[in-house]
Amino acid sequence: VVNGRLNGDRLNDEQLAAHALAYLATELEACRQLSAWAARVGGEFEGKVARAYVGELARNLRGGVDLGACENIALADLGLTDADLADTLLHPEVQAFSAAHSTGAIYLEIAQHARDKGFGNLGLDDEMLEEIRGQFAKFSDQKVIPIAQDVHRQDKLIPMDILEQMAELGVFGLTIPEE
């Protein structure tokens, strides 16, 4: 920061660290929101999903921030010390939490529940939103899923009739303010 503004040259020099910090901030917020959702809806399944996500992230971050191929940033490169890690990611309670809540058996339970009973309470708490969700699920099941694999594997464009039907559902106007 120079004169209260980000220094573009410095940011460019530290772009891997900046990318890692942005990733960490995003993951932290995802953990907060997922945990808040699970607490709000109060279901056992939803809590299991949130705990698995938090536990998996805590376990994965021990090795650094993995941003993709050839982009793994060591936590020390972000200024974290061994003492910082001992108090957080390497703390015995955090490791025990990860070991208890982010296992292959837990993931299998989550997948089986999702397959057999759905994805749990989405917490929409709005009849209209639930109806919209149902309409989109029906559209996806009837129109998208039957052609999705072919479109993907052959790298085809999404057929215009699908896009037109999506437009009729209001997809392309969802983010445009009414005024």
Regions found by a protein language model. Name each.
Residues V1-E178:
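Flavin-dependent oxidoreductase catalytic core characteristic
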